[in-house]
Regions:
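Conserved glycine-rich Rossmann-like NAD(P)H-binding loop of the short-chain dehydrogenase/reductase
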Residues: 50-67
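NAD(P)H-binding glycine-rich loop region in Rossmannoid oxidoreductase-like domains
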Residues: 84-119
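Conserved Rossmann-fold NAD(P)-dependent oxidoreductase catalytic core, especially the SDR/UDP-sugar
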Residues: 99, 125-149
Length: 149
C-alpha cells in the first residue's frame, strides 16, 4: 500500500480502534473492494489485522483483485475474482456484507444507464438470495453510485 494510504489507515485506526475491535473474529464480505472507497476499507482492515491478535477475516469479490497483488500473502484476506452480478452461490457464513460492486465508468453510465443499475441490483439480489436464511449475518450495507440517479 502506498505511503499516503498507509498514513490514512494509521490515522483512521487510531481514531476508531475501539469500534473496529467489535469486528475482531468476524468474517466480512466486501464486493467491489478494488473501488476507491472500499479499497480504503480493505487496507484499513488489513492494517487492523497487523495491530491485533484477534483478526478480521476479509473476503473481497471483485473483477480487479490484481489491485491487491502488491500486499503479499495474508491468511485473513481472500480475493475472489468474479462478477457478483452473475448467478453465483455464496456459502461462507459472513457476519457483515458490504456490497459496493458497480460499473465504475461515467462514460458507460451515460451510454448504458440501465446496465449500470442492473449490475448493482443483480449483485445485491445474488447476495440476498444466498443469505436470506442466514443466522450469522448481522448486517448488509448496500452502496450505489450517485451516477445512477
Amino acid at each position: 500500500m502506498n505511503k499516503l494510504i498507509k498514513n490514512d489507515c494509521i490515522e483512521i485506526y487510531e481514531e476508531y480502534k475501539q469500534d473496529l475491535k467489535k469486528l475482531s473474529g468476524k468474517k466480512i464480505l466486501i464486493t467491489g473492494g478494488s473501488g476507491f472507497l472500499l479499497s480504503y476499507l480493505v487496507y484499513l482492515l488489513l492494517y487492523f489485522n497487523q495491530k491485533n491478535k484477534k483478526k478480521i477475516d476479509i473476503h473481497v469479490i471483485d473483477q480487479n483483485t490484481k489491485k491487491f497483488s502488491n500486499l503479499g500473502y495474508s491468511k485473513n484476506l481472500k480475493l475472489i475474482n468474479t462478477d457478483i452480478s452473475k448467478k453465483i452461490k455464496l456459502k461462507t457464513n459472513y457476519s457483515y456484507i458490504i456490497h459496493g460492486a458497480s460499473i465504475a465508468s461515467p462514460v458507460f453510465y451515460k451510454k448504458k444507464p440501465l446496465e449500470t443499475i442492473y449490475s448493482n441490483v443483480n449483485g445485491l439480489t445474488n447476495i440476498l438470495e444466498s443469505y436470506k436464511f442466514s443466522k450469522k449475518l448481522k448486517s448488509i450495507i448496500f452502496m450505489s453510485s450517485s451516477e445512477v440517479y
